[in-house]
Amino acid sequence: SYPGGTVKNYFFNTVTYAAVNGSQNIGGYNYVFENCMLVRGDLVTRANGNLWYMWAGSWATQTWHTIDGNKYYFRSSYDAAKGIYGMNIGGVNVEYVFSDEGVWLENFTGIYKSGSYSFWVENGIKNKYPGLVYFEGYYYYFKYNDGNILGPMVKNCTFYTDKTNGLMKAAQYQFDEQGRMIN
């Protein structure tokens, strides 16, 4: 937050010097003002398919914005984050999960596939080491790491489950190709 509260953005007509209100096209970008205050910028799809957000005359960077009820994070490259995107929050790396359209999946809890890996996600945040999880009638195990990948699901193997979260005793269990415990 800023000293004195939240920053409010206004735009003044260059001819009348009056604050603008409603829908406005300024510099080729579409904005919405309510009570003369900027409430929505212009979400722009670039030629490469990436989303950028024009807010108060500048591209949004390293910041969150709520647009039409959806939350987006705009990276330092100006692109909306997609897939799993990590940010350092108070010295802790937090990995958020975004849709292919860049919307934070804040209400998603379940198994999220990324490339050849599957991860456990809680409220749109990847859990780095959930261990044993019971989900939709099956047990799944997410191990600590696979090289530099944290928290991947165990699939198609027998694996010693040491972090059971009190669901069963630590032991070797077999998992199928979908990651479901089968014995």
Residue ranges of model-derived segments:
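Extracellular adhesion/carbohydrate-binding repeat motifs centered on closely spaced tryptophans
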Residues: 1-183
